[in-house]
Amino acid sequence: MIRFENVTKRYPDGTTAVHDLSLEVAEGELVTLVGPSGCGKTTTMKMVNRLIEPTSGRILLDGEDISAVDPVELRRRIGYVIQQVGLFPHKTVLDNTATVPYLLGWPKARRRARAAELLDLVGLDPTRFGDRYPDQLSGGQRQRVGVARALAADPPVLLMDEPFGAVDPVVREHLQNEFLRLQSTLHKTVLFVTHDIEEAVRLGDRIAVYGDGRIEQFDPPAKVLGAPATPYVADFVGADRGLKRLSVTPIEKGDLEQPPVVHLDDPLEAARARMRGEGSRWAVVLDDADELHGWLSADAAGDGLADGPDRPATVRDHARRMEAWLPLGSPLKQAFSSMLQHDAGWVAVLDDADRFVGVLTPSRLHEALRRSIDADERDVRRDEVELETVADA
């Protein structure tokens, strides 16, 4: 847990970078600090590992006032990832990854085993990449090594200062996905600095929107997008915040339609009869193990025969392979993108066991988005009532 209590940072020239900040990051939570250059977000983060000292106020790490902790010892307890990565050019990938365990005095065998484990965790085969040097890696690979190095001593807290800002958009999205996968397993307490609202929305459990050294809003992504607290936040988030909501609204089971379902070895005529009976022009096709195979059009070619009059056609003869599907809980944005990419009127959805649970259509997508907006509006009204009650007390 990280707690800021009335923290201010004022420089000798009178510039106040952070004004009376009170903020708490819960254990296992990922909080993104977002805002334009010079707004105080990086200063806030650097005060946690004492690269910058606050002018007043307190910062607590798991209940301990960090001003009483030796700065070097403190930094060895905190993972730190920066945009420039900062790998040592004369050290191999394995040795770079093992930097903090080395400083902590771990035995060589233990730290190298830990480095190999972390490289594998971030998607770099240690047998292929461990003996390489930083200049032999791509930008995305160097960034992965930076994340592995930050995790090597298993710190409870990670500080990440625009770690994916120096790579191209495709690599950036891939790194974001990989980091979300890691966080879902490791549950670190993370302060993540970015100037990109879309990155903040995509990664953060909560978002702190900074403006001129102050937090303008500190809320979950959906609330920041759906109910900006100030005109500044509304302007920073952008006029297309309705589209951005697609990134933070998950597909839920109640959003799905249930089309006719047939199996590969069903007679084609029986499958057509089922579609007619349910008033549908298509059906989802499952294989013998009830796993998703594809789909079948009511206009499937053929006269009900396969190789001749002796064998009636089956669904298998006319089924089309499924080009797109998503797991339950995926953002609506992925579903919308998939429909556009495949020129499809729906996308199949699977559960955690890869079982088919339904399809999401454009109309159901709209209903899901509307539901999310309505829920946020109810939350805002409830908060307003609570504030009025406190004010009247």
Question: What residue ranges belong to the model's regions?
Answer:
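Conserved ABC ATPase "signature" C-loop
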Residues: 212-214
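Short helical segment in ABC ATPase nucleotide-binding domains corresponding to the A-loop/adjacent helical element
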Residues: 94-102, 112, 116, 205
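ABC ATPase "signature
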Residues: 218-219, 227, 295, 359
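Helix-to-loop junction immediately C-terminal to a conserved catalytic motif
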Residues: 49
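Conserved ABC ATPase signature
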Residues: 132-137, 141
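A short, proline-enriched helix->beta-strand linker immediately N-terminal to the Walker B motif
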Residues: 152-156
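The conserved cystathionine-beta-synthase
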Residues: 260-281, 285-287, 303-305, 324-353, ...
